[in-house]
Structures are given as structure tokens and as C-alpha cells.
């Protein structure tokens, strides 16, 4: 089960700070850098605000109790939110499915796609494990 609220900003203080950091990094650096540059800047911004940030966190994928592969999430914040960063012209469905698969493979239910493209944009994805 997935739900999509592209422009709905959760009232959560955590999410508010993450999105403010995203826009601060975008507005400071502007458009045109590689994804890694934005990832490093966002990491430093979130660490400075006191968040626990894991970068390129390995997510194992299992099939019938056998490990069949792994993904690497761009960032995991406070063990509760996955951030997937992009530098695309626009977010596409395959970006959304990538994030949904990360959520499926973990106990984390909330993820954000953050696009540092020509125009900053984000999408929130929620995957319920129940």
C-alpha cells in the first residue's frame, strides 16, 4: 500500500527541518552539480542540526529468507526516513518506484525524493508494512 502527497508537507518538526535543509542547500549551491555534491552538502546541513544521518546505507533484499541483492539508499535520517536524491530534469515514476522498493525492503515507512534539478522538487512516499 502506497500513498503519494507530492506537495503535502507533514507538520512533523523532523520533516520540516529536512525540507528546509533541502531548500537551503539548493538555494545556496544552485543548479548543475553532481548528485554527490548535493548529498555531501545536505549531510553537513543535517548533521549540523543534530540529525543522525547515514549515507549510502546498504539495504538488503530478501526472497524466501535468502539475500538476493542490495540497494544503497542515499541517506537514512534518524533511522526513520529514507532520502533519495536526484539531479534530474523532473522526477519520474521510476524514481518513485526505486524509493518504494527501498521502503519495502526496510522497516522504514516514510521516504522523500529530493530533486536538485533545474527546479527543486520533492515527493513523499509512505509504505505501510501492515
Segments from the language model and where they lie:
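Conserved catalytic cores of phosphodiester-cleaving nucleases, focusing on short active-site segments
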Residues: 30, 53, 73-91, 102
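A short acidic/basic microdomain associated with nuclease active sites
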Residues: 49-65
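A short, surface-exposed helix-loop junction/capping segment
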Residues: 18-28
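Single conserved hydrophobic/aromatic residue that forms the stacking wall/gate
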Residues: 1-9
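Nuclease catalytic cores
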Residues: 12-16, 31-35, 39, 43
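Nucleic-acid nuclease catalytic cores
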Residues: 86-130
Amino acid at each position: 500500500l502506497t500513498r503519494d502527497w507530492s506537495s503535502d508537507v507533514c507538520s512533523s518538526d523532523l520533516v520540516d527541518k529536512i525540507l528546509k535543509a533541502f531548500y537551503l542547500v539548493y538555494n545556496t549551491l544552485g543548479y548543475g552539480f553532481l548528485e554527490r555534491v548535493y548529498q555531501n552538502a545536505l549531510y553537513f546541513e543535517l548533521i549540523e542540526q543534530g540529525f543522525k544521518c547515514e549515507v549510502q546505507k546498504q539495504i538488503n533484499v530478501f526472497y524466501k529468507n535468502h539475500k538476493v541483492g542490495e540497494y544503497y539508499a542515499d541517506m537514512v535520517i534518524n533511522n526513520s526516513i529514507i532520502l533519495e536524491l536526484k539531479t534530474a530534469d523532473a522526477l519520474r515514476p521510476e524514481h518513485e518506484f526505486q524509493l518504494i522498493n527501498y521502503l519495502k525492503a526496510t522497516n522504514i515507512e516514510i521516504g522523500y525524493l529530493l530533486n536538485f534539478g533545474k527546479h527543486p522538487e520533492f515527493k513523499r512516499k509512505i509504505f505501510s508494512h501492515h
